[in-house]
């Protein structure tokens, strides 16, 4: 009924601000607006595809260096159902959990994420 309100209410969980992640009201508003800019049908299809597509076989067949980063406070993709399971499936991966990080890890833990990406790329290219 009220998609903008639902998005705004769930933004706090997306960023895990209840755990002390500092996110400006402007960044929250911008993120909510980005979500609202896509059609409701597209948003539903993305969620539906994520819940109904089984990629376990493909994950187990990966033969490239793989970095898996996941927040331990991700309400959208709970750690025990997603990140940890993926790490068990993908051979020879580098797996890191970010304490206190929600689904918006790329915005709340930017420096750590960028450093981990850099380290992974440097280590994978040698």
What are these regions (language model features)?
Residues 1, 5, 91-94:
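A short C-terminal helix-loop "cap" of Rossmann-like NAD(P)-dependent dehydrogenase/epimerase domains
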Residues 2, 68-71, 113:
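Generic structural signal for small/hydrophobic residues in well-ordered secondary structure
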Residues 3-60:
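Conserved alpha/beta-hydrolase catalytic His-Asp/Glu region
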Residues 38, 77, 108:
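Residue-level signal for the nucleotide or nucleotide-sugar donor/cofactor binding architecture
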Residues 57, 84-85, 111:
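Active-site phosphate/pyrophosphate- and oxyanion-stabilizing loops and adjacent acidic/basic residues
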Residues 61-101:
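Conserved loop-alpha-helix segment in the C-terminal half of the alpha/beta-hydrolase fold
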Residues 90-126:
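Catalytic active-site module of serine/aspartate enzymes centered on a nucleophile-bearing elbow/loop
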């Amino acid at each position: 009924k009220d998609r903008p309100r639902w998005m705004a209410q769930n933004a706090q969980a997306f960023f895990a601000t209840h755990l002390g992640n500092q996110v400006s009201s402007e960044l929250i508003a911008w993120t909510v607006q980005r979500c609202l800019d896509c059609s409701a049908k597209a948003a539903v299809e993305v969620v539906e595809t994520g819940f109904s597509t089984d990629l376990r076989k493909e994950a187990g067949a990966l033969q490239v260096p793989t970095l898996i980063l996941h927040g331990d406070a991700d309400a959208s993709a709970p750690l025990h159902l997603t990140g940890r399971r993926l790490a068990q499936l993908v051979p020879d991966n580098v797996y890191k959990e970010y304490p206190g990080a929600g689904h918006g890890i790329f915005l709340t833990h930017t420096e750590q994420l960028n450093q981990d990406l850099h380290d992974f790329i440097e280590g994978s290219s040698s």
